[in-house]
Every structure is written in structure tokens, then in C-alpha cells.
A protein has these predicted regions:
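Extreme N-terminal leader/targeting segments of oxidoreductases
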Residues: 1-43, 61, 163, 204
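Conserved redox-cofactor binding core of oxidoreductases
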Residues: 20, 128-224, 236, 279-291, ...
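Core beta-strand elements of the Rossmann-like FAD/NAD(P) dinucleotide-binding domain
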Residues: 38-41, 220-232, 451
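N-terminal Rossmann-like FAD-binding beta1-loop-alpha1 element of flavoenzymes
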Residues: 41-68
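Glycine-rich FAD pyrophosphate-binding loop
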Residues: 61-82
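Glycine-rich loop(s) and the adjacent beta-strand/alpha-helix scaffold that form part
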Residues: 229-287, 472-488
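An anion/pyrophosphate-binding glycine-rich loop and adjacent beta-alpha core
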Residues: 266-412, 488
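Long, amphipathic alpha-helical stalk/connector segments used for oligomerization, subunit docking
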Residues: 494-577
Length: 687
């Protein structure tokens, strides 16, 4: 059946609402010659992506005065990234239904994930999912009303569903429309640069935030400084997309990790990420998963003289094996060290990495089938491995060319690139291995609250995931914790308003940092800091990571932060104030991650999930058809590390690492209606 062009356009060209409710300052604060606006609310949400908007919508539904501060309205990772069929992973609602315990086990199967968090995400997926459908997310159904499902990464049960390449953008759109309908107020072009904290020791709690608001710039406030005061704050500005040079994140995605670390909030699982193939960031960054590779395009490289190289044929033993592993990247998209062994699917990524290290450009051609391995037969639909043949047959996609197979299985995947200026039906697509997602982040409890009382983290800002996660589990987690943090905030006892005078010292210090940066000719250059961090992270802490190089990388990151503390950052213009703080946060996040990684390796930590920890003392060696790949010998994972998490806290200018046991799930058999109903009626369960 041919899908009408109008339908394809609706699912790929997704415009965002433009008119939102705004908020005027509640009061003005005079500090020296500056007059600074102060915004008060019962809850502040930082970020306007899918997770932040869900929190804002749920808070407003519960009659909480919520304000959303956002760097760019309805823009960021949720709105601007995706894949072939961007996945939402929830409890299945087709055929035999689902089992929450089994879903929770699947979410945490890779280890290092709290069991109670996994169960919360499993159970909460039903309400989160239904809420999205209710406000208009076009999730596909069969004629009986069951949601269409498929299998994705780390997903044996087939719990994935999708609206196409732009699932998360469509989520942002429908949540934005609901927020507007509910009258949620927004402050656009607002970059939060520091959290405000009240109290000491165990009494520390969130008090608000300092931001740079372009709309508040004026003669008496040249930098646009603004103060937000609130008893509850939700960090929902995403992950640290600028941390790596080789990244598939949209540009200017700094996230909330460094901001939280600076405030002393504990982080967890910073060693856990997702890396995978995607188009390059300087063009149109996008994950090349699912049908982009299940159609089995020809993957090759071009050297600086224009010569073409069928490099994958140097790694796999037969043409059939080569094609099968390109196909399997569709649902084994994230790199996993163990899949580099035994001619598995992550050997594709290793080959791409090695080829790109030699300076060659990697391309994907949808008009040519995989070229043969030397001495073997050509690619043929008559010689496919069983899982490949079954999938293509079930989807009526046993067609001559990759572009035909892709058009049959997912025409939206072609439309998306065409919309962004590249017709993959006509020309090859350049791509590489990129950093795609941080599974770790700020540590939270089962309500999304961090170690700083009143401060929540949701979406990629939160470190709720373990070593691995099913594709689409991150979108689900953001929705579940957007709901849960709203429920807890709405059931808190109202705090008395905080007088802004109590925070003068913190505000004055921030202003002093800005003043010093604007007149600091000897401060570090922003471009230097960016290049230093991104090069080090991609080269020393990427998916190929050499154990003996991490300690030196950590020392370099520590030295960078020491120089920033001593010399400061040169801020060339007033409009660079916000980004100077963001790079300060990236420097902290980089040191935190390398601190955790160095500690993990020193404890004998091995290769799992995101990284191959390469070492001459490693036990495992990937092989190609030409023999062992000795340069990529790696240390294997210690099973006991799956039962632990590494937490990192910034105190007195240094990062400290702690080994923590996983939180377990209480005995669910002890929960009964009559016994537990009062906890719900009185709100006790939220405390």
C-alpha cells in the first residue's frame, strides 16, 4: 500500500506551537547598579523537551503554579533528534499483554540499575503511554485497537512502538499544545547558569536558580541576569551533548549534569553510555538504526584520492555473514563490547572506527547491495541468514535493492533526509560512530528527587538507566518520572516563601564571576576549552578506550578545572556569558566522568555496554577474517560489578567516588488494597 505524501509530510515536517503564556517578574532586586528581575513560582522546570513538558503539564493539572525556563522553546534533543523509527518502549498492549516484573528485569538486564527504579518505569509506562495517546500522539494501532509493536535493542519481547522518525518531536508537540491549553507559563531564551541552595549539611535544599535571560537585558541589567525562586525545581535540560566531539546530539545541548554537579548533587553511572552509527553532527545528526541498516545498504569508505574500499569484507568471513550483521545493527544498534567477538554486529562499528581513524570517509549507499567478500559469492536474497530472511519476508521486503527494501519498510526514513537536504535514493550518506546517549546522570530516588532536597532530575539529566537499556526506554523513563515528580511535588507541604535577601551572597558571587570574566584578558578561551574537552573525551573515553590512557586523561581534565578556577574564563561579549558557564559545567562533567571511569578501571572493571576497555592484559580479542585484532584486545566484565553503582559527588573542589549496592524492590506480595489505600488517601506514599 502506498502511503500518501501528505501523511509522510505530517510525520516528518512537525511544526511547533509558537504562542505561549509568558510570565512577568514578581519583583525587582537592586544589587549595586544592576536591577535584576526575580521570578517566583511553586515549581520551576528547566527545559522544554518531552520530559520537562510532561512534568510541567502534570504539575499544572495538579494546580501547581509552575514556570518553565528554557534555553530555546521546544528545541533540543527531544525535538531535534531521532532514528528511522524512533522508539517508545512501554509495557506491551498487543496479543498476550505483558508482565511488569519481566519488563523491569529487561530494563535492568545489563546490570547497575536499581530494581525499584526499573519496576517504577515498567508500571508507570502504562499511565505515561495512555496520557500521550489521550492528548494526540499518533501511536499506530491494529484494527482491534492494539498498539503495533516490534523488536528493538536489548528487547527480546518486542515491546517497541513508534510514530516514525520523529516520535519524540511529536511528543514535544502534543505536550506543548497541552501545556498551552493549561496556561503553563514559559520564559524563553533563559539559560540557567547556577542553582541556588538554602541551608547547610543535611538541611540543604533547593531555593531556586540564577539564569541569563536575553529578554531581561537592558540598561540596568546588561547581562540579562535573572533570579528564579522556588521550593521545587525540576532539571529536565537533557544530557551533556557537547561533551564529545563525535556526537549525534543537536548542537548547543549542554544538559544539566555539570549544573547539578557544581551544586554538590550526587551523580551515578557516569561510565555508562550509548555509542552507535549516525550521520555526522556538522550536517544532519541522526541515528542510523532500524530499517536504515535492516535494508542492508552497501557500507564502504573513500580515501583522500577518491578510491573506494569495501572494508567490511576484510572483517567478515562470507558475504552472507557480512550482510546479516549490517542487518542486525537495526535492533543491536548500540555498540556492545561482547558483540565485537565471534563476528558479531558490533564488529561493524569496530571496523568503521578503525577505517575512520585512517582518515577515510565512511558512506552508506542505498542503491547498491553489500559487495562480496573476496573469494565468496555475490550478495543474494536467496542466501540470507534465517533471521534476516524471516524479517524481510514478514514485511514483504524481499526486493532487489536496499532503497526498494527501505521504501517498502519505512518510507518516512527516506522523507526525513530529503526534508533535510539529502536524497538518499540518489546519493550515498556519510556517517560515523558517535556518542548518542548518557545512561548515567544525576542520581534520583523513585520519585525523581536528587540528593539535594526539592531538586528533581528527569529525562537524560537523571541517571536512572544501567549498563544497557532497551531502545525507547529513555523516552519512557522521562515520561514516567515527569509524572512521578509532579505527583510528589503536588503532595508536599507548602514551604514559606524565601526572602531573596537570604541568597544575596550566592547571587553576588555569581555576578562577580561574570564581571571578572568580562574583563579577563588572561582567562581561558572558550573555543580552546571546547576543543580540549571534546577531543579528550572522544579520543580517550570513547567506545574504544585504552585502560592505560584514562589516568592521564583524568589528570588533564583536573588541570583544566584548576586553571579555570585560578585564571577564569575570558568572556569576549555580554552575549557569551551564558555559554561561558555552560563550558565551565562541561569541564566539571568531563572530570566527573573520567574520575568514575578511572576508578572503575582501577577496580578491575571490564568492557560492557558502551565501552571496550582495551589492554594488553585483556582476556578477549575480536577477530576478523584476516586474524586476531590484537590492538583491540579488551578486559572482560566482572559479573559482580553488575550489582554495583559508582556514585560521584563534587565537594570542596574535588570529586569523590563511592561504590553503592543496587536498591532492591520491596516484597510486592505484602501490598494489599485495604492496608495500602490509606497511604494513597493521606498522601503518605509520597513522603
Amino acid at each position: 500500500m502506498t502511503i500518501p505524501q501528505e501523511t509522510l509530510d505530517q510525520l516528518t515536517h512537525v511544526p511547533m506551537p509558537k504562542h505561549v503564556a509568558t510570565r512577568q517578574p514578581n519583583e525587582m532586586l537592586q544589587l549595586g547598579a544592576d536591577i535584576i528581575p526575580v521570578y517566583r513560582s511553586e515549581a520551576l522546570v528547566i527545559g522544554s523537551g518531552a520530559a520537562g513538558l510532561r512534568a510541567a503539564v502534570e504539575l499544572r493539572r495538579r494546580h501547581i503554579d509552575v514556570l518553565v525556563a528554557t534555553q530555546t522553546l521546544f528545541w533540543g534533543t527531544s525535538a531535534c533528534s531521532g532514528s528511522d523509527k524512533q522508539t517508545l518502549h512501554t509495557a506491551a498492549t498487543s496479543k498476550q499483554g505483558d508482565n511488569f516484573i519481566k519488563l523491569a528485569q529487561a530494563l535492568g538486564a545489563g546490570g547497575a540499575m536499581d530494581a525499584d527504579t526499573a519496576y517504577v518505569e515498567a508500571v508507570g509506562s502504562v499511565e505515561a503511554f495512555a496520557g500521550l495517546k489521550y492528548i494526540g500522539l499518533p501511536l499506530p494501532e491494529d484494527r482491534y485497537g492494539a498498539i503495533l509493536r516490534y523488536q528493538t535493542d536489548h528487547d527480546e519481547a518486542g515491546r517497541a512502538t513508534s510514530c516514525g522518525p520523529r516520535t519524540s518531536r511529536l511528543m514535544v508537540k502534543v505536550l506543548a499544545e497541552e501545556a498551552i491549553r493549561l496556561g503553563v507559563a514559559f520564559v524563553d531564551h533563559s539559560t540557567v547558569i547556577r542553582l541556588l541552595v538554602a541551608g547547610e549539611g543535611r538541611e540543604r535544599k533547593i531555593a531556586g536558580a540564577i539564569a541569563i535571560n536575553s529578554g531581561d537585558r537592558g540598561e540596568n541589567n546588561p547581562t540579562g541576569l535573572a533570579i528564579y525562586l522556588c521550593p521545587s525545581l525540576v532539571l529536565a535540560a537533557g544530557g551533556p551533548g557537547e561533551l564529545f566531539r563525535d556526537s549525534v546530539y543537536p548542537k548547543r545541548c549542554f544538559g544539566s549534569l555539570g549544573l547539578g554537579l557544581e551544586a554538590g548533587i550526587t551523580a551515578v553511572n557516569l561510565t555508562e553510555h550509548q555509542f552507535g552509527i549516525g550521520t555526522r553532527r556538522d550536517e544532519f545528526p541522526w541515528n542510523l538504526s532500524g530499517t536504515y541498516v535492516q535494508c542492508m545498504p552497501y557500507i564502504y569508505s573513500v580515501d583522500d584520492k577518491g578510491n573506494e574500499h569495501n572494508f567490511l569484507a576484510e572483517y567478515y568471513r562470507t558475504t552472507q555473514e557480512l550482510a546479516a550483521n549490517i542487518f542486525r545493527k537495526g535492533y543491536q544498534w548500540p555498540i556492545h563490547a561482547t558483540r565485537m567477538l565471534d563476528f558479531g554486529s558490533s564488529l561493524v562499528d569496530l571496523a568503521i572506527f578503525s577505517e575512520s581513524q585512517s582518515g577515510r570517509t565512511i558512506l552508506m549507499d542505498f542503491n547498491r547491495n553489500p559487495q562480496p567478500v573476496a573469494g565468496d559469492e555475490s550478495f543474494s536474497l536467496e542466501r540470507l541468514e534465517p533471521d534476516v530472511a524471516s524479517y524481510l519476508s514478514n514485511n514483504d521486503a524481499l526486493l532487489p535493492l536496499p532503497i526498494d527494501r527501505l521504501r517498502r519498510m519505512n518510507p518516512l526514513a527516506i522523507e526525513l533526509y530529503k526534508y533535510h537536504g539529502q536524497d538518499i535514493s540518489q546519493s550515498p550518506l556519510a556517517f560515523n560512530v558517535n556518542h548518542q546517549h548518557m545512561n548515567g546522570g544525576l542520581a534520583v530516588d523513585t520519585w525523581g528527587q536528587t540528593s539535594l532536597s526539592g531538586c528533581y532530575a528527569i529525562g537524560e539529566a537523571a541517571g536512572t538507566h544501567g549498563v544497557t537499556r532497551p531502545g525507547g526506554a529513555a523516552l519512557n523513563a522521562g515520561q514516567v518520572f515527569g509524572l512521578r515528580c509532579a505527583k510528589q511535588i503536588a503532595n508536599q507541604t507548602a514551604s514559606p516563601p524565601l526572602a531573596v535577601a537570604q541568597l544575596h551572597k550566592q547571587i553576588a558571587q555569581c555576578m562577580a564571576d561574570i564581571t571578572q570574566g568580562l574583563s579577563n584578558e588572561n582567562g581561558l578561551n572558550l573555543q580552546q576549552i571546547k576543543a580540549d574537552i571534546q577531543q579528550r573525551m572522544s579520543d580517550k573515553a570513547g567506545f574504544i578506550c585504552y585502560a592505560d590512557e584514562v589516568s592521564d586523561a583524568l589528570q588533564a581534565a583536573q588541570q583544566l578545572n584548576q586553571v579555570i578556577q585560578q585564571q577564569g574564563i575570558a568572556i569576549p561579549y555580554v552575549n557569551k556569558v551564558a555559554v561561558s558557564f555552560q563550558w565551565r559545567h562541561m569541564a566539571l562533567a568531563s572530570e566527573a566522568l573520567l574520575t568514575a571511569l578511572d576508578f572503575y578501571i582501577s577496580q578491575g572493571g571490564g568492557s560492557r555496554g558502551a565501552r571496550a576497555i582495551c589492554s594488553a592484559q585483556g582476556e578477549a580479542v575480536p577477530e576478523s577474517r584476516q586474524g586476531p585484532l590484537a590492538d583491540y584486545r579488551f578486559i572482560t566484565e566482572k559479573p559482580e560489578h553488575r550489582q554495583q553503582q559508582l556514585t560521584v559527588t563534587y565537594q570542596q573542589g574535588k570529586f569523590a567516588v563511592t561504590v553503592s549496592s543496587l536498591r532492591q524492590l520491596d516484597d510486592l506480595n505484602a501490598i494489599f488494597f485495604e492496608k495500602n489505600w490509606p497511604d494513597f488517601l493521606t498522601g503518605a506514599l509520597y513522603r
